[in-house]
């Protein structure tokens, strides 16, 4: 039986294609944040509990904003950024017209993977290399994004893949789910008086 093929990314009326962070990666990171910080108000000293109760949702908004990064393609060029609701305060992102993209440069990471940078064409009359911009590799439909990038720039993207294989995030998702389940069971035990925190 043939492997199922993921549906292509949707195309807006103006021809823009958007590539958000892959759902497996985004929701795993969000769940991991919750698993790590939800117990903190209960475990903290009484004087810090109210502050932590307020800090947890603020941190969640920050993680939601960071993981909302997306890549957009249209007839003019390539853009990397965030939705309007958080772009004004994150102030991250970049954009390049297609004709300004001159090369794709790999850089090895300390974990043995490779990240890729999109390099701007060198300005006429200068000897310095063009500025480089980090290319997101955790997006949904990465293979389609690379096909579009190669078709529009003529650069070879066949060597560009994900920084980490999917099984690493699948394993992290399972471990995170187990952490959340254990915390829910512990919370239920505390609520029923079946268990008490040390020092309480």
Model-derived segments and spans:
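Short N-terminal secondary-structure initiator segments
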Residues: 18-22, 52-72
């Amino acid at each position: 039986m043939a492997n199922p093929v993921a549906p292509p990314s949707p195309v807006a009326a103006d021809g823009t294609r958007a590539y958000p962070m892959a759902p497996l990666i985004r929701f795993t990171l969000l769940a991991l944040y919750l698993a790590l910080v939800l117990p903190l108000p209960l475990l903290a000293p009484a004087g810090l509990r109210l502050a932590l109760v307020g800090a947890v949702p603020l941190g969640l908004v920050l993680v939601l904003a960071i993981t909302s990064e997306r890549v957009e393609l249209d007839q003019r060029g390539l853009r990397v950024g965030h939705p309007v609701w958080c772009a004004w305060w994150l102030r991250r992102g970049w954009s390049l017209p297609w004709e300004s993209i001159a090369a794709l440069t790999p850089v090895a990471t300390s974990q043995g993977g490779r990240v890729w940078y999109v390099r701007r064409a060198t300005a006429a009359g200068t000897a310095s290399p063009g500025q480089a911009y980090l290319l997101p590799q955790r997006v949904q439909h990465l293979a389609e994004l690379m096909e579009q990038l190669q078709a529009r720039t003529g650069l070879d993207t066949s060597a560009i893949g994900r920084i980490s294989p999917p099984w690493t995030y699948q394993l992290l998702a399972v471990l995170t789910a187990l952490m959340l389940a254990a915390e829910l069971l512990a919370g239920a035990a505390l609520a029923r008086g079946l268990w008490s925190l040390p020092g309480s």
